[in-house]
């Protein structure tokens, strides 16, 4: 009985860490895209009025329009859905038979700055703060804030980031391996259908 309880606690901690990473690595807009798609996917609806959708998803109509625009951008990288906004009052979202919500998440994750920073750090290909800012068309200060966010998530795994000396990741090796295993699993595993 005690062993089952300990396993449950460990499983819960792992799930919470995954949620924390999910919340951290995606922008707020991408999180909203994911939640909107999850609503359509899980409810098996194809058409929804914006005011009803706003109520069900806790997003404003204006935010839903931003989500729609972001979804159009994502459609170029992952074309397994059709999305349309009709007269600013109704949204339709059709999924192809091979659409995976987890794959959409992977596409958004691959584009996110925190993931790209962590990926470069992991592969020892990190470039300077200025180059990173130029690659993402943001200010140096924005990259610094993203690095702070990266440090925050690493702290959840008892890992520190030290850009001055190698190794860049400071912590117990099994924790570092576990963190990157989880991170890469989230982007490359397309079997987890929500």
Kindly give the residue locations of the regions a language model identified.
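Inter-domain helical "communication" segments and dimerization helices
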Residues: 1-194
């Amino acid at each position: 009985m005690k062993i089952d309880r300990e396993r449950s606690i460990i499983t819960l901690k792992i799930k919470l860490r995954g949620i924390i990473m999910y919340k951290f690595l995606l922008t707020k807009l991408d999180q909203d895209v994911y939640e909107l798609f999850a609503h359509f996917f899980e409810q098996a609806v194809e058409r929804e009025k914006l005011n009803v959708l706003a109520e069900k998803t806790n997003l404003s109509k204006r935010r839903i329009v931003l989500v729609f625009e972001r979804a159009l951008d994502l459609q170029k990288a992952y074309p397994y859905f059709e999305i349309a906004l009709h007269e600013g009052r109704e949204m339709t979202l059709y999924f192809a038979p091979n659409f995976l919500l987890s794959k959409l998440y992977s596409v958004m994750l691959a584009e996110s700055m925190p993931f790209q920073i962590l990926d470069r750090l992991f592969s020892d290909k990190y470039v300077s703060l200025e180059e990173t800012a130029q690659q993402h068309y943001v200010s140096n200060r924005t990259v610094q804030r993203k690095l702070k966010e990266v440090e925050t998530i690493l702290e959840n795994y008892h890992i520190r980031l030290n850009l001055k000396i190698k190794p860049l990741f400071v912590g117990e090796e099994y924790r570092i391996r576990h963190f990157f295993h989880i991170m890469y699993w989230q982007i490359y595993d397309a079997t987890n259908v929500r």
